[in-house]
């Protein structure tokens, strides 16, 4: 697979879980003999939801809820077949969204 690059994007609501997953991916691929660039922290996406507390009136009383989506980027430069195989068999938590592009 000379000249190719695998790009992995991780997304999660919990920053500790995403950092552990990124570390696990980097260790697994490095042990398989490929070179890794990252994990690169991407900007955190912040989604704010504003809800009126009262069901009828008192519009000035509002509650703010916030969802933060943490993102990381990992590039695998010149992946070996062993690295790709180990990447496919890695166990990661369910709350981490993974996108893999060749």
UniProtKB/Swiss-Prot annotation:
Gene3D superfamilies: Ribosomal protein S10 domain (3.30.70.600)
Keywords: Ribonucleoprotein, Ribosomal protein
SMART domains: Ribosomal_S10
GO cellular component, one term: ribonucleoprotein complex
Top-level lineage group: Bacteria
BP terms from Gene Ontology: translation
InterPro entries in the cross-refs: Ribosomal_uS10, Ribosomal_uS10_CS, Ribosomal_uS10_dom, Ribosomal_uS10_dom_sf
PANTHER family named among the record's database cross-references: 30S RIBOSOMAL PROTEIN S10 FAMILY MEMBER
Subunit-level organization: Part of the 30S ribosomal subunit.
Purpose of the protein: Involved in the binding of tRNA to the ribosomes.
Family: Belongs to the universal ribosomal protein uS10 family.
Identification of the protein by name: Small ribosomal subunit protein uS10
Organism: Bifidobacterium adolescentis (strain ATCC 15703 / DSM 20083 / NCTC 11814 / E194a)
Phylogenetic placement of the source organism: Bacteria, Bacillati, Actinomycetota, Actinomycetes, Bifidobacteriales
Gene name of this polypeptide: rpsJ
């Amino acid at each position: 697979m000379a000249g190719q690059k695998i790009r992995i994007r991780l997304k999660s609501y919990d920053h500790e879980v995403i950092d552990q997953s990124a570390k696990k991916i980097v260790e697994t691929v490095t042990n398989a003999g490929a070179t890794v660039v990252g994990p690169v922290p991407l900007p955190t996406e912040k989604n704010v939801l504003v809800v009126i507390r009262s069901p009828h009136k008192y519009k000035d009383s509002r509650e703010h809820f916030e969802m933060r989506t943490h993102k990381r980027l990992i590039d695998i430069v010149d992946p070996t077949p062993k690295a790709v195989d180990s990447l496919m068999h890695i166990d990661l938590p369910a709350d981490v969204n993974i996108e893999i592009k060749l």
